[in-house]
A protein has these predicted regions:
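Conserved, mostly hydrophobic/aromatic
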Residues: 125, 166, 232
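Catalytic beta/alpha-barrel core
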Residues: 45-49, 68-72, 84-104, 144-176, ...
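Alpha-helical scaffolding segments of alpha/beta enzyme cores, especially the outer helices
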Residues: 26, 106-117, 151-155, 175, ...
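Alpha/beta catalytic barrel-like cores
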Residues: 1-96, 162, 205-228, 233-278
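Short beta-strand/loop segments at the ligand-binding rim of alpha/beta enzyme cores
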Residues: 63-69, 118-122, 183-207
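Active-site-adjacent beta->alpha loops and helix N-cap segments on the catalytic face
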Residues: 94-114, 172-185, 210-211, 243
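Hydrophobic alpha-helical segments and helix pairs
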Residues: 74-123, 127
Length: 278
């Protein structure tokens, strides 16, 4: 995403990398401002890559904000960062060849096992893209996707992969979210479930939430077994583009990001308080 924001055509230069690292600090400042204005720090965490986000992680830990980093080329790339979570974005086909699945599940089991020993939990943002045959079998693409996600979680659990947090994009499969959440908690597992939102770069909303963000935030708040949101780069993409092009000042970008996060938090809390489920 940062290559897109900075319009980097090829391999990033050292100057490009420093610019990208600075933009990550802007996003963190937005989160920090939101926390200072009332979002409970115990309810938020920041997920960055270990390549450019070390300074952000250190500042987050100093504020007692939860931290997560992607493993990159292996577990060693995040061990030295002392993060609270190892974050993995994964598209998985539970019907793919057995040897392909076994290899991946073993890798995840290693991460999960390391987590048990080192008190670092996994965040798995999971998706599944159905094949034409799978769509045919289930009748439509959304029903196929929901069932593949459910089957994927079952396979991970059977393989001993213990994720502290599961995250899913609920668009199109809203009616299946309670089932996915129930599977994540099966047999008394203490996993938490998040719904992914703000992954749309096309809709330009600074302080206003777009329709998808409102819908998913309310869905998360009103669904038993769902604990919160995994907020994607759509919440700050346009602010960073405008900042990098000189259209807005740094402080304006930070405040806009903070307001966006505050609006989502307030909508979640208001919707949860009004829900008969809780």
């Amino acid at each position: 995403m940062y290559a897109d924001v900075l319009a980097i055509p090829g391999k990033p230069s050292s100057s490009n990398r420093e610019q990208a690292a600075d933009l990550k600090r802007v996003v963190f400042e937005g989160l920090r401002t939101a926390v200072k204005q009332g979002i409970p720090r115990s309810s938020v965490a920041i997920w960055v890559d270990g390549d450019l986000g070390e300074s952000v992680l250190l500042r987050a830990k100093a504020m007692s904000i939860g931290t997560s980093a992607s493993p990159g080329n292996g577990l060693e790339t995040v061990k030295h960062l002392f993060v609270d979570y190892i974050g993995i974005q994964l598209s998985f086909d539970p019907d793919s060849p057995l040897n392909t699945r076994e290899q991946l599940l073993k890798q995840l089991d290693v991460l999960s096992g390391s987590n048990r020993e080192g008190s670092i939990q996994l965040i798995i943002e999971l998706d599944s893209t159905p094949t034409a045959a799978q769509i045919d079998n289930f009748g439509n693409s959304m029903k196929a996707r929901a069932n593949l996600l459910l089957k994927s979680i079952e396979q991970f659990q059977d393989a001993g992969v213990n994720s502290g947090l599961w995250a899913f994009d609920p668009k199109g499969i809203e009616s299946y979210i309670p089932t996915l959440a129930a599977q994540a908690h099966i047999d008394g597992r203490q996993s938490k479930v998040l719904l992914s939102t703000s992954n749309d770069f096309l809709t330009r909303n600074f302080n206003e939430l777009n329709a998808d963000e409102k819908h998913i935030t309310r869905l998360a708040a009103r669904t038993h077994g769902v604990d919160g949101l995994l907020i994607g780069p759509g919440a700050y993409y346009h602010q960073l583009v405008d900042l990098s092009k000189g259209r807005i000042a740094r402080d304006e970008a930070i405040l806009s990001i903070a307001n966006h996060l505050i609006n989502m938090s307030e909508l979640f809390e208001k919707s949860r308080a009004a829900s008969p489920v809780f």
